[in-house]
Design a protein with these regions (language model features):
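Acidic, low-complexity, intrinsically disordered interaction modules
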Residues: 12-62
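Ankyrin repeat (ANK) tandem alpha-helical domains that serve as protein-protein interaction scaffolds
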Residues: 1-7
């Protein structure tokens, strides 16, 4: 396996893990409620956007 093939495979694996993680996080409202609560503790909209979850933040916080 060449370096470029290895890097390509690694990128695919990372993209898949991110996709699964997003689906799992978004579909479990208990987790979302734990990460963000009404008292201002936990993750904010900006935290989600900076982590690459802008679409999720737009839906959850608006």
């Amino acid at each position: 396996m060449t370096d470029s093939e290895y890097i390509s495979a690694l990128k695919g694996l990372i993209d898949s893990a991110i996709s699964v993680g997003r689906d799992w996080l978004w579909n479990d409202s208990d987790i979302m409620d734990t990460l963000t609560d009404e008292n201002g503790f936990g993750l904010t909209y900006d935290d989600f956007v900076m982590a690459g979850f802008k679409e999720m933040a737009d839906e959850y916080f608006n």
